[in-house]
Every structure is written in structure tokens, then in C-alpha cells.
UniProtKB/Swiss-Prot annotation:
Stated name of the protein: Glycerol kinase
Record: residues binding ADP: 12, 16, 259, 301, 400, 404
GO cellular component annotations of the record: cytosol
Biological process annotations from GO: glycerol catabolic process; glycerol metabolic process; glycerol-3-phosphate metabolic process
InterPro entries referenced in this protein's UniProt entry, alphabetically: ATPase_NBD, Carb_kinase_FGGY, Carb_kinase_FGGY_CS, FGGY_C, FGGY_N, Glycerol_kin
Annotated family: Belongs to the FGGY kinase family.
Reaction(s) the record says it catalyses: glycerol + ATP = sn-glycerol 3-phosphate + ADP + H(+)
Binding positions (sn-glycerol 3-phosphate): 12, 82-83, 132, 237
E.C. number(s) listed in UniProt: 2.7.1.30
Origin: domain of life: Archaea
Top enzyme category: transferase
Residue numbers binding ATP: 12-14, 259, 301, 305, 400
Pfam families documented for this protein: FGGY_C (PF02782), FGGY_N (PF00370)
Length: 491
């Protein structure tokens, strides 16, 4: 009987389940959305039980659509939105809503801690202190949910990121993997353990934390489909995408084009620090840890959504490609989509969106082109930062916006690097499936996985150097003018 791997891909707005075969082909997908809650400005929450219910429905739909028997599922892998923080009791019941990675409620707390301990935190965790990561969210819960700290001291509270919660609901085991642990701002990425000094700074009892394991091993067994199935793969979404892109060698880099862009480069067994990028754990496998540098760009695909829903100059995201191609060049129009500040490598929370260079002749095609170009410029900003530490030959891409050929060609041109789009676009779920399959010998080795990675299209750079650098200089100038704007208007 043919065997398959089930991958659970738990995102920020939906829970998905995908069944993969031995060649990495998709046999069936289930996907269900769940709501986000905004109790106060800047606060973002999920109901963990709504995530769980959506995930269970997605699993059942994927199995049904794949037309496979539960007994044919050889292992389950999990990948997840990272940093989102959940606390629950030993019966698996949540004790508060999940505090989502986007939530800014702890920004002031983190600013205070950063002033005193910023360098220490970066040295130990690889992260630039921010409300984005789990540590301050856990502290907020312990300080604000009635009796939670008291219960935690009695050993009645469990914390985890979403992967950890799902593994607990599936198997009863309280574990996470290295990649997810490295996003909590509590995990020492050199010692590979929870850091006592950081736990003290954030006033978090160690007893609530999950055991940290490799990204590919059997964590426990589940009977979600009736029969016993090992849960044996776990990685945060961006790390899973790098694994799914077979980015196993030092210097291999992937960019995921979603609401924002996330760019990860494999730095091998070495912990490398960059002033403007995050250092993170890519995965733990066969007793070895692989590290990565990460650049997070907050707004990319969301800028295209704004063209559609905000100023309503397009009906569908795909229209931007045709509009952009109506022009020979950007005609001096730049758009810096700093709607929520700028992420890597600028880290300016006071930057705001800017459109510059418009004239009476500027039309919607200019705005569409400037938006797509901005995504490519922002990606180059991060890759230039990475290249200071590690050589990069090509960019492997995934995510919704990679279907846009204009964007992919412009990306290759502005980077002066080959851009490679794979056949299977679901690289995040595929990465989790590979990790799960390796643990149960469904796949034998990284070499076998590498041989399954297939190219759909390669975009070679075609732009001359003078044009490329002139365009990029214009971009850098536009960014300068967008930076700090929120401070200017509030002073």
C-alpha cells in the first residue's frame, strides 16, 4: 500500500493540511480560515480552540480529497506562524487567547528591556529585541491574566508557540523544535537551551516551557485519524520553507513573497551576527544544528492589497503585471510601502509610506509598477546585507506573488542574480513533510530530497549595470525621505 506524509501548515489567518507523496507532489489540500481579534488598537489575538478546530477540519478534508486511507499516512509534520504565544493547562485547555506575532501590546515593555539588555539578548538569542517575539508576550500574560502566575508557579501552566500547542493536542507531549524555540527570545542559540538569565530578566518560570527537540524526530503518536500515526517533523514557517526549497548548503537563500517578505540564508554550522538582520536556527537534524540569517520585510504583498482594497485602482492582484508592462520604465515614480514602519535592514518603526516622483501624467500603471519594483528593491536591501557575511549565487522564491513574471524578472535584474521558481510552490508545507518523512525513513537522506526539487522557471538578469544602479539609487533616496516621518508629524 502506497504511503503518504501529512503536513499541517498553521498560518496567521488559516489552518491548512496537505498530503504529499514520495515525489513531493500534492495529493490533497484542506484549508479553513479562523478569525483574528483586535481587542484594542495594536492588539492581535486568536482563539486557540478555533485554530485547533480549523486544523482538525483541514486534516479531514485533505485526507478525503487525496483519496487515501488513514493507514497510508506514515507521519505528520507541522509548520506554523512563529512567535505567537499560547498558554494552556494540562488538559489542553487554553488559559487566554493566543497573542499573535503581530501584536504590539508589549512594545513599551520591550523598549525598556532593550535599553538595558539589548546587546545581551542579541548575543544570546540572535534576535533584535522586539514585541514581535514570544518573551514579552509570556511576561504580559503572567502579569495580567488573573492567578496565571500563581498557577504557573504550581506547575499547572504550559506555554508554547502554535506548533507546541498542536503537538500537545495531538500527542499529549509538551515539546517544540530548535527553530521555533529560537524565536521566543528566551533560547540560547549557542548553548541550545533555555537561558536562565533571560528567564530572570523576563520573570518567566522555566517550568512552563516545552522540551526543545530536533526538527526531525518522533515527538509522540496521535490517533486523530483513528490509527496511530507518528508526529515527527516540526519547524517554524520560514525555516520550513528553506528546507522545502532544499536550501541545505551554506549560502543558499530563499525569499517567501507573502503579505510581507521573509528572506532566509543558510549560514551552516556557524552562528553569524549582522547588525541589521536576525540570527536564527534553521533546523536541528541528526545531532547537528544549522543556522540562518533572516531579514523580515513587513509590507510587500500587503501593498498590492492596498492598491486593490485601499485606493481601488485594481480588482485583482494579477492586474499589476499587465499594468507594469505598459511602461518602459518607472518614469521616476517610487513607492515606499512603509505602512507599519520599515523592517530589515532599516528597523525604523517611525517610517511611513511614501509615493514620490508623480507628475500630471502619472497613472495607475505607474503605481502598479512602483509597487512591484518596491518589493524587489526591499528584497535587494536584505540580500545586500546578507552578502556582507555569506556569498549568494541565486535566489529561490516561493509564495503567492512569485506567479507575477514581471516581478520575478525585475527581481533578477535589480539583484543581478538568477531567480529560481520551483514547480511546487507550497514549500513551507513541503519542508515540514520532508522533516517528518526523514524521521521515519520515508525519505532516506537530504540528497534524495535534493533530487526531488524541480525548477519551473529561471529568470536570468537582463538589465545593464548603469540602469540597475541608477534605479536603486533612486530607491535609496526615496527610503531616506520616508524614514522617521511619524516623528516629524507628531513633534
Amino acid at each position: 500500500m502506497e504511503g503518504y506524509i501529512l503536513s499541517l501548515d498553521e498560518g496567521t489567518t488559516s489552518a491548512r493540511a496537505i498530503v504529499f507523496d514520495r515525489e513531493g507532489n500534492i495529493k490533497g489540500i484542506g484549508q479553513y480560515e479562523f478569525p483574528q481579534y483586535y481587542p484594542k488598537p495594536g492588539w492581535v489575538e486568536h482563539n486557540p480552540m478555533e485554530i485547533w478546530d480549523a486544523q482538525v477540519r483541514a486534516i479531514k478534508t485533505a485526507i478525503q480529497k487525496a483519496k487515501v486511507e488513514p493507514a497510508q499516512i506514515k507521519a505528520i509534520g507541522i509548520t506554523n506562524q512563529r512567535e505567537t504565544t499560547i498558554v494552556w493547562d494540562k488538559n489542553g485547555n487554553p488559559l487566554y487567547n493566543a497573542i499573535v506575532w503581530q501584536c504590539r501590546r508589549t512594545a513599551e515593555m520591550v523598549e525598556e528591556i532593550k535599553r538595558e539588555y539589548g546587546d545581551l539578548i542579541k548575543e544570546k538569542t540572535g534576535l533584535i529585541p522586539d514585541a514581535y517575539f514570544s518573551a514579552s508576550k509570556i511576561r504580559w500574560l503572567l502579569d495580567n491574566v488573573p492567578r496565571l502566575r500563581e498557577k504557573a508557579e504550581r506547575g499547572e501552566v504550559l506555554f508554547g508557540t502554535v506548533d507546541s500547542f498542536l503537538i500537545y493536542k495531538l500527542t499529549g507531549e509538551h515539546v517544540t523544535d530548535y527553530s521555533n524555540a529560537s524565536r521566543t527570545m528566551l533560547f540560547n542559540i549557542k548553548k541550545l537551551d533555555w537561558d536562565e538569565e533571560l528567564l530572570e530578566i523576563f520573570k518567566i518560570p522555566e517550568g512552563i516551557l516545552p522540551e526543545v527537540r530536533e526538527s526531525s524526530e518522533i515527538y509522540g503518536y496521535t490517533r486523530i485519524l483513528g490509527n496511530e500515526i507518528p508526529v515527527s517533523g516540526d519547524a517554524g514557517d520560514q525555516q520550513a520553507a528553506l528546507f522545502g526549497q532544499a536550501g541545505f548548503e551554506t549560502g543558499m537563500v530563499k525569499a517567501t513573497y507573502g503579505t510581507g517578505n521573509f528572506i532566509l540564508v543558510n549560514t551552516g554550522k556557524t552562528v553569524r551576527y549582522s547588525e541589521n538582520l536576525l540570527t536564527t536556527i534553521a533546523w536541528g537534524l541528526d545531532g547537528k544544528v544549522t543556522y540562518a540569517l533572516e531579514g523580515s520585510i513587513f509590507i510587500t504583498g500587503a501593498a498590492v492589497q492596498w492598491l486593490r482594497d485601499g485606493i481601488k485602482i485594481i480588482k485583482h492582484a494579477s492586474e499589476t503585471e499587465d499594468l507594469a508592462e505598459k511602461l518602459e520604465s518607472n518614469e521616476g515614480v517610487y513607492f515606499v510601502p512603509a505602512f507599519v514602519g520599515l523592517g530589515a535592514p532599516y528597523w525604523d518603526q517611525f517610517a511611513r509610506g511614501l509615493i514620490i516622483g508623480i507628475t500630471r501624467g502619472t497613472g495607475r500603471e505607474h503605481l502598479a509598477r512602483a509597487t512591484l519594483e518596491a518589493i524587489a528593491y526591499l528584497t535587494r536591501d536584505v540580500i545586500e546585507e546578507m552578502e556582507k557575511l555569506v556569498g549568494i549565487k541565486e535566489l529561490r522564491v516561493d509564495g503567492g506573488a512569485t506567479a507575477n513574471d514581471f516581478l520575478m524578472q525585475f527581481q533578477a535584474d535589480i539583484l543581478n542574480r538568477r531567480v529560481v521558481r520551483p514547480v511546487v510552490k507550497e514549500t513551507t508545507a513541503l519542508g515540514a513533510a520532508y522533516l517528518a518523512g526523514l524521521a521515519v525513513d520515508y525519505w532516506e537522506s537530504l540528497e534524495e530530497i535534493e533530487s526531488l526539487w524541480r525548477v519551473e522557471k529561471i529568470f536570468e538578469p537582463r538589465m545593464d549595470e548603469e540602469t540597475r544602479e541608477k534605479l536603486y539609487r533612486g530607491w535609496k533616496e526615496a527610503v531616506k525621505r520616508a524614514m522617521g516621518w511619524a516623528k516629524v508629524i507628531s513633534s
